[in-house]
Amino acid sequence: MVGLLAGCVSPIALNRAVIAYDDAVTDALSQQLLINIARAYHRQPIHFTGVSNIAATFSFQANAGAMPSPGGLAGASIMPIFGGTFAENPTISIVPIEGEDFTQRLLTPFPQNKLTLLLRQRYDVDLLLRMMAQEVRLFQSPHYEIYRNSPRDTANYEMFRRVVLHLSAIQDDNKLYAEPLPLIHTWTIPARAIEAEGFQALQKEFSVRHDPISNTYTLRKHTAGPILITNYDPALLSDEERDQLNDMADDWDVSDIAFDIRADHYGGAWPMRGVFRLRSFHSILGFLGKAIGADAGYHVDKDVRTPPILNDENPDLTMELEISRIPPSEADISVRWNDRFYAVKTTGPYARWNRDAFQLLFLLFQMTVTDIPRVGVPSITIAK
């Protein structure tokens, strides 16, 4: 019976501990995100502290005994006694994000593959680009026109918003692609330059074709080029079109993501070609913080050439926050900083949008995670 008692208690304690620690870590990070948006609004330094390790040691002790039963026959009746004690000793290691880790996680712009990964999770491209992109560069031959994602610059901001609304409308109709540009590299070499062993090695990496007239081999290799947002399947492009887009990509940075909207496909009433330049996480927090004050977003109508947008979803703000002197009663999570409570607004017509925006912010922070130094202990140990 004693062993059974200890065996039943330990799994229950473990389950509760795992869930409790998971909730605590998630809430702590969520509150840090809100606090740092508030810090950005007040032009205070942004700082994060990460939980690198949680170790919890559980001790279970059970005992048993017997005593005369009250009211018994002068001790002739014995009553068993069972008891036990439970002790928990948690150890939590926290590490401030600083130095080179701060530079890599918070100051380095997001690479294009991070945005593509989120697009494949079916996040709204409008939400993604409004939060992650600092500007759009529209190609107007022979140069680019730059439109910044800053509400303070009215003309730039409104063009930026119209471009991302156009992409969102294409996505709503399931006609938006975000795929690596398929490239084919071709080389022609004399047949006499290849020996038998070399020929076998080439066949492992290239498709090889022999031309008996010129006695040459043509080598072809398929590679994945830069990621491209389009309203058509990039695999259908001709070799010449792929080469043209690849030549343009030579001027792009790893934090740039290009788009090519063509006239003969859905959304083609407004053909455009250009590049979005992505922000760093530090810049995203600054953008959201400024939106609390004078740099708040505002309503921008879609372009007349843009197809209908699903449910006419077009919030003024990328993520709306509530600020109050008392704890907000309907907020999912809030944090107190400098005698004010900050929370994501989860009421009204854009409650879902705001929740999605905060979830996206949480994911973006997780996507910056590097290896956090860990103490050499297991996550949870159980001792009985």
PLM features: residue spans?
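C-terminal motif of bacterial Sec signal peptides marking the signal peptidase cleavage site
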Residues: 4-7
